[in-house]
Amino acid sequence: LILFGRARDQLVLNIWAFQRAFRHEVGHGKAELVSVHRVDLLDENKTSGVQIFAPNMQYVADHDATSTLSIPSGDRVQIRMLTPMRLQQNGVPLGPDRLTSRAFFMTLVRRGSLLSMYQNGEPLNLDFKALGEESDAVRLNVSMGWKDWTRYSSRQKQTMSLGGVVGTLAFDNLSPALRVFLAVGLLTHVGKNASFGLGKYVFDKKGMKGDGVL
């Protein structure tokens, strides 16, 4: 579970909601919340994290809820998609042969702007036209394939098909602004159904060139 902005202040409510959901069946059976750990998803040396809550604890333990972004500074960045990415055009999911740098980066930009508006009360002050032009200038190398992914919706009482593309994407000629959004996307994910965990990626150092991160 990744909480952004003001949602971080609702951690206790989220824990309670999970406890209640587990008691009233999640998926096809009941479960029990036994522990909550705080993990820094951007820490390459992360282990199991630090326990901040268990049912026998009266309060959520004090903990650092911040993460520090590492922004790529090299002239080539490669990412590896861990869960299916669903970019769409006119309501149709884009397969590997239809992916474009504009579709990828402008999806990241829009998501970042919306999160800022809902969590900080105002959208980011962005020049969307300029960012679109910078996206068009990026050289894209796609090494991806389609992966079907399904989940069961208890509310709709049916299986939902949420397939997307997985694999690697390499970007050349990235502007500084796009590098920032690429780093932010490590936490926000990219594409449709990101709230379900889709569109999650990591930096692939095997395909990175330049002097590392800022």
Predicted ranges, named:
Residues 1-214:
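RNA-interacting cores
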